Regions:
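Long, C-terminal-biased catalytic regions of enzyme "large/alpha" subunits
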Residues: 1-160
């Protein structure tokens, strides 16, 4: 439900208070989650942690930095990212949420593509939002705008 309220409440507030500050992509408004960095401002993993350090480092729970990844990474890459975050920063929680791509005929596709490299069919893409996997095609207008605004990181973005 949280992903739908980010759009619905922002839309209602924008109608009642036209000057209110929301995130937006053209006419599609949305709110970001709590004290998260606005998705348009994300540059990379390290810079996200540096930005959030002062505030989120004060918490012992109830907050998380989501690393929304363009695609899958290896277990060793994930360990390296988590180790760097835990060694260099004080934020209490981090999640790594890659986009997973699936062809209806050929299964999981590792490449960062929209069509199956074997048959050319459009891929179904899934990413974790609000704690569970959702098909990106099923996002509401606000969540789609947020997704389109967000930088999807790669392993190479770890030092940015």
């Amino acid at each position: 439900m949280a992903e739908s309220t980010c759009y619905r409440l922002a839309l209602n507030d924008k109608k009642s208070y036209p000057d209110i500050i929301t995130q937006e992509n053209n006419e599609d408004v949305y709110y970001t989650n709590s004290c998260h960095l606005p998705v348009k401002e994300i540059k990379g993993i390290s810079s996200t942690f540096k930005h959030q350090e002062i505030l989120q480092g004060q918490f012992t729970g109830g907050t998380v930095i989501h690393l929304m990844m363009k695609g899958g990474i290896t277990g060793d890459q994930a360990k390296e990212i988590i180790k760097a975050c835990c060694t260099n920063f004080t934020e209490p929680y981090v999640s790594i949420s890659p986009i997973s791509r699936f062809c209806p005929d050929h299964g999981y596709v590792k490449e960062y593509v929209d069509e199956c490299p074997l048959c050319g069919k459009p891929l179904k893409k899934f990413q974790r939002i609000t704690g569970y996997l959702r098909c990106i095609d099923n996002y509401n207008i606000g969540k789609t705008a947020e997704f389109n605004d967000r930088k999807q990181m790669t392993y190479e973005d770890k030092d940015n």
